[in-house]
């Protein structure tokens, strides 16, 4: 989904805006509406991407809390970033890229980035071992 979002935002929308900028006055209105439609597709994809990312992180957080392989706060951090990311997806769907949507989404995504780095560090340190495995059998 993120790839589709980047394709719409970085390629299709730029093409539409460039076409609008270069068009003669008689064609500008139609191209404006076409560019606006592409922008609405971008908003829809961004909304779904936020919902999906937030849901995934939240479910990982729950799994980390249940599993107990890693510190409890790692699972909590996933949920602290995941839930507002889902909320941002709902806000983006209803208000577009509004100030409110960005005020929710940007800090939540920053938390998820921190969470991913922390979880990666925890997994690296544990070497993939389960707490109930003998040290001699742990993978390095």
Task: Describe each model-derived feature in a short phrase.
Residues 1-140:
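Hydrophobic, aromatic-enriched alpha-helical segments typical of multi-pass transmembrane helices
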